[in-house]
Design a protein with these regions (language model features):
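Catalytic domains of carbohydrate-active enzymes that cleave complex glycans
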Residues: 64, 90-249
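Structured mid-domain segments that build the active-site/substrate or prosthetic-cofactor binding neighborhood
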Residues: 3-118, 122
Length: 249
């Protein structure tokens, strides 16, 4: 078992993993990979791993891996960032689907999000395009990939998506679930003295409960998680420091 980042870079930190993978493929035909497609610390936080997941699975197949366990959000309430799409992409790639990632994503989004599909794809690509370094499965909202500019662009796109589908339809509910990822990112990055912060937290958890989401942190009750968000924040703009940090009221 080797913990690795989101990219299999033969010249970077993942070189040893790739070396071991190739080595094992030469001595066994029963090679299995346990991979991750989720942020366990923040289920709702955007976790742009689709492109890396696509490339990694293709590489696994090329090397001769027999099976892949692509672990995601296992909480009963679901609602994590793009859970359904990630499961669909992985399932297609693990069969004999040789289409491009864009084709598979469009097929899913057209069927799942309806008229909002083009905006959802734009939203997905906004975060995927912003990955410049490593993506970690315990990243926080103060990660270097999340900026005020990115948050504002996400707000515009996801609101366009909501406006493009009719309230009360299954497509609207699907988009609303994705909207949680923006709302969560926005809320947990607010300063404790931000005007209307309490109202924003109320809005976030009201929607979380309305959609039946039961966990937003791994193995943590929703009640505890709500208390954490109400009393603390993720600090922004702390150079070279991207782990969880709380300022308590």
């Amino acid at each position: 078992s080797i913990e690795e980042g989101a990219k299999l870079d033969p010249n970077g930190r993942n070189a040893q993993f790739l070396h071991d993978l190739i080595g094992w493929s030469k001595i066994t035909k029963r090679l299995y990979i346990w991979d991750y497609a989720v942020n366990y610390r923040n289920y709702l936080l955007p976790f742009p791993c689709l492109r890396s997941m696509y490339k990694n699975i293709l590489l696994y197949k090329k090397i001769g891996v027999k099976g892949v366990l692509m672990e995601g959000n296992f909480s009963f309430g679901g609602g994590g960032y793009l859970d359904e799409l990630k499961a669909y992409v992985a399932s297609r790639l693990l069969t004999f689907d040789n289409r491009s990632l864009d084709e598979i994503v469009k097929e899913f989004c057209d069927g799942y999000y309806g008229k909002a599909s083009k905006y959802v794809i734009e939203y997905i690509n906004l975060f995927e395009d912003n990955i410049k370094g490593d993506l970690w499965l315990y990243d926080d909202a103060d990660s270097e990939i999340f900026t005020d500019d990115l948050e504002e662009k996400a707000r515009v796109i996801i609101n366009n998506a909501l406006s493009s589908v009719s309230n009360g339809t299954k497509e609207y509910k699907h988009v609303l679930t994705l909207y949680l990822s923006y709302l969560y990112l926005h809320t947990v990055r607010l300063s404790l003295d931000e005007k209307n912060r309490d109202e924003e937290v109320n809005k976030l958890f009201s929607l979380i409960k309305e959609l039946g989401v039961t966990e937003i942190f791994e193995r943590t009750s929703l009640e505890f998680s709500e208390n954490v968000v109400r009393k603390s924040r993720y600090c922004k703009d702390r150079e070279n420091w991207y782990s969880l940090y709380y300022i308590m009221k």
